[in-house]
Amino acid sequence: MISSYGDVDMELRDEDLILEEVRDYLTAYLRNIHQEDIILDNERVVVDLNQLYNYGLMEFVEFLINNPQKGIDFIKECYNDAYYTLRNEYPTNVIIAVKNLPKIFKTTRKGKIFTIEDIRSKTLGKLVEFEGIIVMASKIRPMLKKAYYICPKCGREVVREIDILNTDSEKAVCECGAELNLIEHKSIYTDFQEIKVQQPLDLMENPEEPPKYITVFLENSPGIYAGRVKITGIPIKVKKSKKLPIYDIHVKALHCEVLDGEVKIKLTNSDIENIKKIAKRKDVVNILADRLIPEIKGHSAIKKAVLLQQIKGVKKPGKRADIHILLITDPGIGKTVILRKIAEIPGNLYGSVTTATGVGLTAAVVREKTEIGEDTWVIKPGLLVKAHKGTACIDELTVNKELQSYVLEAMESQTIHISKGGINAKLPAECAILAACNPRWGRFNPEVSVAEQINIPAPLLSRFDLIFPIRDVSDKDKDKDIAEYIVDLHRAYLDEKINREMGLDYLEVDGVKIDKEFIIKYIYYARQKKPIISEKAKELFVNYYVEMRKKHQITARQLEAAIRIAEAHAKAKLKDVVDEEDAKEAINIITECLKEIAYDPETGIFDVDKILGVSKKERDKLTTVYEIIKELSEKSELVEHEDIAEEAKKKGIKEDELENIIKKLIKYGDIDEPKPGRYRLL
């Protein structure tokens, strides 16, 4: 049998003999398994090669992999015969595609799954199967597939099957020497699309190496613009240099399957046993959170929140399961280390807004010359689309007004709509966002609203479930601990004994080795759980929301966030029910977060509007001054500053406060100042 692409361990028998031996058997298989295709007269029939292999046609599948075009033509012959036995006629223009190679044929000699980086000259003309993430997709264009010609000189009609590489197909010449004319109404066209795919990082032999790409040609494409795909196709060579015999390798796809995007991780019985063993510990969440980012000292609340973000809440119709987190950090805290560490989890991606354009977050539609030489519109999915089903780790997050609506849609509905250049598509962006940025003035100021300190619009800011300011506050004892940890960290990389003492690479708990690989497997296993909220947990959530609404200015968004966090906490402990413990933990995380960013010391309450730049107290004062100007404007179109100040003083508003309030009313577009010191309503 074939143990890897292009390496045959057994001598193939005569091709015609192999085909004739399986003809009746294959015809019977197609008549039984693809009976629905025949009855419905489907134009495209997809044959599952793994199923065919298990059916007993091992030698034919091996033949097809080494001779894909001849093998598919033979399947088509047998399908036509099967079709005839059921319908007493032959099909017209049926297209045969194949998918799902048996495992033995998509494993390399090294024992790893076949990937883009394994496509070499030895695989040319063979059948291969690999996964990729779409990084560019052209618009759909018609491609001539079956051409009907007529000779204007002798009247002879000619029919030709057109291959994707036959660029001279429309300049066919008759035997008499005259150039043939294409008969448009008879000729058959198919939908053609060109995509470029990147090898997923989780399938890279060395994730530190630059990612590998390959161009794929799709025929009969429904229009695929983003996501993770599995391609079954034939590597072909395309000459690029006119002077040298050097070629580029592309893939002619026979089948393209859009995957759900979630990375599949193989777990052994031993893995599951160890996961369940650790899950029994009361401190399991703390252990995993601390080991998730061992390079960073402290910040346990943030580590815990990020761990729960990776596990996710429970997906429900119309409700996202992903938890969005924003870190606002003073310089030198290590936000990039946190983001890059989380990006190492399969399915997650890292990107910095400083090194990518704004549309690099969402998607771009640009005109570009494709491999077939045409200048056309193409979609280039951005970070949020490529991180579908994972986490988008965004460094130096800033969002301009032009991009705001796209990112807002991605955060809330988890899709991105694109309509430009004849391309109208809805791209999936079901991902969590772990973003980080520095305060505008260098260091975070708890006295100033979050919105005023960062370049992120208020509507987007409100979509983050958790916002953590990480401040660099001088503390002698704490500074000493951090300094010692940093020095030991450098020593641990070179000294195995210190490494073990620190537990940098791994920590042994109850006989289980807790390392990066184990945590990834634990997260993947925990994600599969779907705990239901218990009555007692429900009561806690309801009471929390009602009590907080009485005293504090919070919204239903905080309740939704608490539910997602509680579900993730229950999943982290492998529970089937979200109980009181999980609800309390979620409420504590939300409350701690609000203390940092939404506590108003003047009123002693939590006010989420303070995050967005306007606290309840300030909002009341804005309303008061606006009403004063409104009342005074009934007497005069332009209201004098002195008159406003006099009335405001009666309402308890001081002069210095009034200046800021008037500036904000102008900023919000409620009033303007056509002349110095004179205002009017808008």
Curated annotation (Swiss-Prot):
Keywords on record: ATP-binding, Cell cycle, DNA replication, DNA-binding, Nucleotide-binding, Transcription, Transcription regulation
A single GO cellular-component term on record: MCM complex
Recorded GO MF terms: ATP binding; DNA helicase activity; single-stranded DNA binding
Alphabetized Pfam families for the sequence: MCM, MCM_lid, MCM_OB
Domain of life from the UniProt record: Archaea
InterPro entries recorded: MCM, MCM_4, MCM_CS, MCM_dom, MCM_lid, MCM_OB, NA-bd_OB-fold, P-loop_NTPase
MCM domain ranges (all copies): 284-487
PROSITE patterns xrefs: MCM_1 (PS00847), MCM_2 (PS50051)
GO biological process: DNA replication initiation
Positions annotated to bind ATP: 329-336
SUPFAM superfamilies for the chain: Nucleic acid-binding proteins, P-loop containing nucleoside triphosphate hydrolases
Family: Belongs to the MCM family.
Protein name (database record): Uncharacterized MCM-type protein MJ1489
Organism: Methanocaldococcus jannaschii (strain ATCC 43067 / DSM 2661 / JAL-1 / JCM 10045 / NBRC 100440)
Taxonomic lineage: Archaea, Methanobacteriati, Methanobacteriota, Methanomada group, Methanococci
